[in-house]
Amino acid sequence: MDTTTSNPRIEASAKYIRMSPHKARRVVDQIRGRAYEQAPMILEFMPYRVCDSISQLLSSAAANANHNFGLSKTDLFIDAIQVDGGSFLKRIRSGARGRTYPIHKPTCHITIVMRMDSGWRNKISLRRFGK
């Protein structure tokens, strides 16, 4: 964790989330680069199961910023968020003639990096979306 007080780097990670990394990346791409206040609203209206895990992780990162650096949650934005593949849970399915077939249930690791919002980021996002 970066200990400089000018623009600290706040990290939070969740490991072994029982979701395919491909499905989690679909959700993560929607909130990357957004302000902290916008991200929970976006996640709330998305119909995917992984949104709950990402929302919990997001609130954990904001709590880390508040507790460790004394930053307000309104000043934060998501600088980086990444989804990496985890290990597979291996299960067995019964097959014909006494055979067994493997089932691989994927897991993923999600890492969020948040930073303090300096005013230029809001101007760029407003310009990008034409508001």
Curated annotation (Swiss-Prot):
The keyword Nucleus is assigned to this record: no
Organism domain of life: Eukaryota
Any one GO CC term of the record: large ribosomal subunit
Keyword terms of this UniProt record: Plastid, Ribonucleoprotein, Ribosomal protein, RNA-binding, rRNA-binding
InterPro entries: Ribosomal_uL22, Ribosomal_uL22_bac/chlpt-type, Ribosomal_uL22_bac/org-type, Ribosomal_uL22_sf
Cysteine disulfide links: none
Localization per record: Plastid
PANTHER family, sorted: CHLOROPLAST 50S RIBOSOMAL PROTEIN L22-RELATED, LARGE RIBOSOMAL SUBUNIT PROTEIN UL22M
Protein family according to the UniProt entry: Belongs to the universal ribosomal protein uL22 family.
Function: This protein binds specifically to 23S rRNA. The globular domain of the protein is located near the polypeptide exit tunnel on the outside of the subunit, while an extended beta-hairpin is found that lines the wall of the exit tunnel in the center of the 70S ribosome.
Protein name (record): Large ribosomal subunit protein uL22c
Naturally occurring in which organism (per UniProt): Aneura mirabilis (Parasitic liverwort)
Gene name of the record: rpl22
